[in-house]
Amino acid sequence: IGAAQGLFLALYTAQSYAAVELLPAQDARFYVYGSALAVVLLIGGLAASFFHLGHPERAWRSATRWRTSWLSREVIVLPALMGAVLVYGLVHWLGWDLGTFGIQTQVPGDLTLIIGAGGALLAFALFLCTGMIYACIKFLQEWATWLTVVNYTLFGGASGFMLATAYSAYASPELVNFYAGWTAII
C-alpha cells in the first residue's frame, strides 16, 4: 500500500512541477496508467490485509471505532484514497479541467491538480494512520515512537518514487532523473 501511495505522490509531484514549467508537461496517458497502477496496488494491499485478520468476516465492523482506533481510521482513509486516485486518473483520461465546468484558469490540468492535492492529503493521512497503528502498541517498545510514522512515510515515499522511476523509464524517459533524484533524497 505504501508503494502505491508513494507512486501517486510521485505522479502528482511531477504534474505540479510541470504546472509551473519546471518539468515538461506529460501526456494524460502517463497519469492515467500511473494512477491505474496505483489503484491496482492499493486494491492488492487491501485484499492482502484480509489475510492477517483473525476473523475476516468481522472486517466490515472495523470502521465503527474511528474515534479511538487508528486501524478504524485507516479503514476509512484507504478507500477514500483509492477513490481519489481513481478520480484523478479518470479526470486525466476524460481530459477535463475547470473550463469544462465554466471556470477559466491559465493552469493546464487545473482540475486534476485540485483532485491530486486532496489525494496527496489522503496519502499522508494514510501514512499517519498506518504508522500510528504500530506506534501505539506499547509492548513493542522499538515501534512505540513517533519515528514509526516517519519510517512508514519515508519508506512508502521512497518505494513509490522508485516505482515511478521504473514506470517513467518505460512511459516517459525524460522523467527518470527527476524521479530517481527524489528517490535518493527521500
Language-model segments: which ranges?
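Alpha-helical transmembrane segments of multi-pass membrane proteins
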Residues: Q5-Q15, G45-S49, V87-L90
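Long, contiguous internal "core" modules enriched in hydrophobic/ aromatic residues
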Residues: I1-A3, A19, R65-W70, I76-I186
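N-terminal signal-anchor module of multipass membrane proteins
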Residues: I1-L37
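Membrane helical hairpin/interfacial module
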Residues: L23-A84
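Alpha-helical transmembrane segments of polytopic integral membrane proteins
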Residues: G6, A10, A47, L53-P56, ...
